Amino acid sequence: MTIVGHILGFPRIGLHRELKYALEYYWDGKIKEDKLLEIGRTLRIRHWKQQKDSGIDWISVGDFAWYDHVLTTSLMLNNIPDRHRIGQENINLNTLFRISRGYSLDKKLIPPSEMKKWFNTNYHYIVPEFVPNQEFKLNWTQLFDEIDEALSLKYTVKPILLGPISYLWLGKIKGKKFDRLSLLPNLLSVYQEILDILLSKNIDWIQIDEPILVLELPLQWLNAYLSAYEQLHGKVKLLLTTYFDSIYHQLDIITRLKIDGLHVDLVSNPDNIPLLHARLPKHWTLSAGVVNGRNVWKTNLHDWFKKLYPLVGERSLWIGSSCSLLHSPIDLNTEIKLDKHIKEWFAFALQKCYEIKMLCAALNAENTSDATYEDTLSEYYISNNLRSYSSTIHNIQVKKRLEHIDEISYSRSSPYTTRVTLQHKKLNLPLFPTTTIGSFPQTEEIRKLRSRFKNNQINKEDYHLNIKNYIKKIIMEQEKLDLDILVHGEPERNDMVEYFGENLNGFIFTQNGWVQSYGSRCVKPPVIIGDISRSKPITIEWISYAQSLTNKPIKGILTGPVTIMSWSFPREDMQRKTIALQLALSIRDEVIDLEKSGIGIIQIDEPALREGLPLKRSDQKQYLEWAINVFRITVSSVKDDTQIHTHMCYSEFSDIIYAILALDADVISIEAARSDEKILKSIRHVIKNLNEIGPGIYDIHSPNKPTQNDLIRRINQLLKYIPEQRLWINPDCGLKTRSWPEIKHSLNNMVSAAKLLRKQFYSS
């Protein structure tokens, strides 16, 4: 039996982020739809060829998406919220963008669908919406069109389809509550139709993704798998695909399914290969996800060879990535500035394809007693074996400081009830204080300035002078808007994680290591390669300068340790807890220096706190314990009258509400504008125990411009759950990606709405 290689998906954005720019040009009206479609087609053809040239046997089709793959699935199933059908006879590309971004109709804002994190990654998906008695039907033909494209180029095609049970689980109910599984029979009829079409195209295998099987699911959802795959089996061979965690707890159910193969993320749990082999039906194909799709380190191919070799000849075996390579940068060969010794430690998406080819070749060759491949695998990883001796990754002072971590208090010196009185006296803020989350528009001019400085085209003095001029403008604009708490706007920061990584020891940075976060939004995560420490203050110059320009309080913005770790590519030779503690000590030093410089409000952004939560509930308690302690170590040194804020992004806050309480931040702002009242309803039983909260009164990711009345309605909604003395008024996220005209309009209406309601409360 020949062992074949495949991947679970390939990055779609393009080596130079071509898809990002094409989407933004299209949204801005700078290119037509036919040009956008042409760019997408060019990217797909290039990516298929790259996979084939790298030695991949089955070419994945269906991983390309104009915004995200879950939304693509919704369109294929004709699951379009009624508010996005208005004025549109047929589903088209603009329908997709309406759902993901929102739009205006007759001066009325039509909100986008909710956006959520894709499991425990920094990728986001647009949440499907379900109503009682909803009917699905086959509509959007993107998958079939792309299969035809690939077949015309003579590739061996493996279509990718999000499975029906996971699709239902990932969605949300709109309106009256009902059992989402009641929609399954109708949904399965559409999936059968899809499989019939694939059969007519002579498709042999389909990758059907059911990632929720790694969760600890209710029994009725597990039982739904049995009937669903009984119904779907027999048309095209089904490779049931799971990722991001182990599925050993579900083997009793999985082994009863009518499928033809199973993909398992072995990176998450590599030690149970013998158990898998013993438990899975002998006629099934086992797809071994051994190349990490979520990190950039080389794979220890020789180690995997030894683990997988006993299966050779015993069953049908595929070698694959642990998950989609969507979460990986594309090509290491473009990183011409990386130190060559450090570069040898890494593998990006194309190199990961080559790793799969190498492992397949070695396992296949072993069938013919050719052992030379095994030596090649050992040589491939030798640089990573030597890494543990590198002075680049070790810092004795950091290790010594960690040894004494228990000497640091995990708590503020006084409880919130004491602190709040001192803080209110010092800050003298009105009811419904207004602020922003931190960043202001990153104009082309600012980006060019940073690029020129990075490329040594201007000196440090000129760069600092220009950045301070931008800060001055940002302060002036905020004062004109009459915001209560100001920020310096972060013009010096390219990215909230990359900026801090650049100013800490233990990180390296890529030129082209971009990965998609959502839609056209891409991030370039730094790589943590060694022990982390702070050599000098990072933000003091900019934030202190901002405070010198105004009598209003300036809020210093820092990225928190858990988020820096989660949004970087972490070390694989160190536990996440230890990495986070190293970061906590570094950011703690910055907090101390900010307070010494006279900054009385400090915000520690932790948007990734929920994201880092293990997928299995039984594993979550331990993570939350150390994540909470990491945050508290970061801020425990400050005085009682220093106000500590934190900010969190798209999250199921009900899952971690007690952890949020345990952070003991004075003010928390959350990204909740897309969620209507859902988040507040889910935590209403503990809101009385929260300190102060700013839920976000408008969605900055949508181009919609909220009116004053829109914002008043939103604030009144919030007041049903939050006492007025504890409610802050703010956008739901940073303003980096918006234009100045947009934010002036929205913030002016936000401040006006707060003032109007403030007046009503003071006079009542």
UniProtKB/Swiss-Prot annotation:
Pathway annotation from the record: Amino-acid biosynthesis; L-methionine biosynthesis via de novo pathway; L-methionine from L-homocysteine (MetE route): step 1/1
Claim: Transmembrane is one of the keywords in the record: no
Superkingdom of origin: Bacteria
E.C. code: 2.1.1.14
Binding site for Zn(2+): 647, 649, 671, 733
List of residues binding L-homocysteine: 437-439, 490, 605
Cofactor: Zn(2+)
Entry binding sites for L-methionine: 437-439, 490, 605
First-level EC class: transferase
Keywords (A to Z) from UniProt: Amino-acid biosynthesis, Metal-binding, Methionine biosynthesis, Methyltransferase, Repeat, Transferase, Zinc
CDD domains in alphabetical order: CIMS_C_terminal_like (cd03311), CIMS_N_terminal_like (cd03312)
Keyword Signal: no
Cofactor note: Binds 1 zinc ion per subunit.
InterPro entries for the chain: Cbl-indep_Met_Synth_N, Cobalamin-indep_Met_synthase, Met_Synth_C/arc, UROD/MetE-like_sf
One BP annotation, GO: methionine biosynthetic process
Catalytic activities: 5-methyltetrahydropteroyltri-L-glutamate + L-homocysteine = tetrahydropteroyltri-L-glutamate + L-methionine
Active-site positions on this chain: 701 (proton donor)
UniProt-listed SUPFAM superfamilies: UROD/MetE-like
Residues where 5-methyltetrahydropteroyltri-L-glutamate binds: 17-20, 117, 521-522, 567, 611
Record-level Gene Ontology MF annotations: 5-methyltetrahydropteroyltriglutamate-homocysteine S-methyltransferase activity; zinc ion binding
Protein family: Belongs to the vitamin-B12 independent methionine synthase family.
Functional summary from the UniProt entry: Catalyzes the transfer of a methyl group from 5-methyltetrahydrofolate to homocysteine resulting in methionine formation.
NCBIfam families: met_syn_B12ind, PRK05222.1
HAMAP family cross-referenced by the UniProt entry: Meth_synth (MF_00172)
Protein name from the UniProt record: 5-methyltetrahydropteroyltriglutamate--homocysteine methyltransferase
Gene: metE
